[in-house]
């Protein structure tokens, strides 16, 4: 099994993250910046994140309008920055891979 890694996230409704806020622009700019610096990408936008389905996340899932979306990162400072920029989001963290979260980036969304 892979070594456990801590992941940080912001969580909001898909509508808020993907339509109301210009988050795609922020992520595109950050991706470009990472490529210029030859840094490995450490953030991902996930529609309907599967980690919300585990029992320990039930209360958090209830607080978030569905369908949800998350930006997950191994960089806590990036998530803190996003939280300050976006305001109306839920933040948290988890460790994976684990028995309950085998794939931290898994989505329940089917690609159409």
Located regions from the model:
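Solvent-exposed, low-complexity segments and loops of surface/extracellular structural proteins
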Residues: 9-10
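Well-ordered, non-membrane alpha-helical segments in soluble/globular domains
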Residues: 19-31
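Polybasic, proline/glycine-rich intrinsically disordered low-complexity segments
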Residues: 54-112
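N-terminal chloroplast transit peptides
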Residues: 1-4
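Eukaryote-biased feature marking scaffold/signaling PDZ-domain proteins and nuclear chromatin regulators
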Residues: 38-41, 66
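Eukaryotic intrinsically disordered and solvent-exposed regulatory patches
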Residues: 28-33, 56-58
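Short acidic, S/G/P-rich loop/turn micro-motifs used as interaction or catalytic elements
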Residues: 13-22, 50-54, 77-79, 102
């Amino acid at each position: 099994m892979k070594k456990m890694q801590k992941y940080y996230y912001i969580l909001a409704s898909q509508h808020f993250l993907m339509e109301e806020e210009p988050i795609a622009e922020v992520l595109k700019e950050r991706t470009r910046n990472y490529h210029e610096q030859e840094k490995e990408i450490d953030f991902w936008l996930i529609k309907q994140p599967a980690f919300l389905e585990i029992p320990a996340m039930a209360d958090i899932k209830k607080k978030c309008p569905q369908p949800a979306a998350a930006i997950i990162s191994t960089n806590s400072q990036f998530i803190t920055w996003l939280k300050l920029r976006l305001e109306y989001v839920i933040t948290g963290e988890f460790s994976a891979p684990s028995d309950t979260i085998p794939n931290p980036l898994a989505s329940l969304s089917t690609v159409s």
